[in-house]
Amino acid sequence: MNRTLLKKAALCCGLLIASPFIAFGQIHEGGHRPDWNAIDTISFLSFNDFHGAFVKDRNVPGAAELVQAVLDEKAKNKNTVVVSVGDNFSGSYFSRITRGNPLPEMFREMDVKMSAIGNHEFDWGLPYLVDTAAVCMDYIAANIVAKDDHAPLEWLEPCKMVVQPLKNGGSVKIAFVGLTTTDTAVKTRSENIRGIDFVNPVDAARVQVATGLKKEGKVDMVVLLMHIGTDMSNPDVIEEENAKRLPWIEGVDAIISGHSHKVVLAEVNHLPIIQAGVNGTHLGKLNFEVKQDAGKYTIQYIGGDTIRVAGKGNSVIDSLVNKEMDKYGFEEVLTMAENDLIHDRNINKKDYTTVGAYVTASYADTFRKYSQISKKYGKQSVVGVNHYGGLRASILKGEVTCLLYTSDAADEED
């Protein structure tokens, strides 16, 4: 495995070498030499586990507000790099019916540089991910390889570099290394991940850094973009056992995480780790001071923030969402709810809830209807079952529309 990963890393590093950056000390166009004593700030802005939450709801800001929040933050610092940490499109009824639209336009509006691959990226099958999603955005994952021989995948790069210009005329080269939870192998339909394997994230990340991203001066910073869960209540912050050593890899400057839907801002081994909730409720922001002295960069973490997304929506994205709403009749009223029916992963995830009862009853009723079990066997008991993590939304008081189906996150292709 290590030999294969080294091969892939070498390929990635070769791409980095070919990138259009300017070597230290060179005179720039017009005879301008960088001011090596200047101080600048680079910000990493991230969101994760959007899950196709395009439509604004009581606890969900919607795509338009998320995009506008990103643009507002970028206006504060032009040296801002925007990234996604995976689980982008699957998880809402709206997104399933629209096939992920308008996610491509949304990413372009925010200038999202790349995305980690989340476990739910495979919900609609590998052909969709390879032929549609990966065409619209740059996915990266260093620990996803071919199952038979652990060879690199043609459609997937382990890392990507961003060359960020600075105000003095210089530039900082930042390598993002993608990682995906190895739980994907057991939590995803086998046919949706046929032919690929998920290897140890620490080994994969260490290979990427050790092959020279930092040591040979190819990049100035290395950021792990990982769809692996983190939680402030966990003593190690990183939840998965095979990923806990990631903060101790020499040469890594920051970890931007997703998967566990938590709001996280922490430091482990003096390394900043951030996660920005779920459904676009928050943005994660990490700030680094870049000081240039005698032709060398000194880069230091100076703080971060988890920003609640709220406020006006972006008119371009709002128009696109409304267009899809009208096209598919998502606002058709099915019934009325007299009270809020709450099923919240952070409140009563493992409790009996009315939402859970309705969803599982619908499974049983549908089975009775289409199997014609009563005609074949007479009166029979049918039990509908869903695991407690499978329900993702409440049913709120008032008009209940077709978007009700977002409550059931069983969003894989049939």
Where are these regions (language model features)?
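Acidic, metal/ion-coordinating pockets
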Residues: 26-309, 355-362, 366, 374
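Conserved small/polar residues in nucleotide/adenosyl-binding loops
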Residues: 405-412
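A short C-terminal boundary segment appended to hydrolase-like catalytic domains
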Residues: 38-39, 171, 185-186, 290-400
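Bacterial N-terminal signal peptides that target proteins for export
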Residues: 2-10
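Bacterial N-terminal signal peptides
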Residues: 12-20
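Glycine- and acidic
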Residues: 52-53, 190-192, 341-349, 407
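Charged, often glycine-rich, active-site loop that binds/positions anionic groups
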Residues: 96-98, 397-402
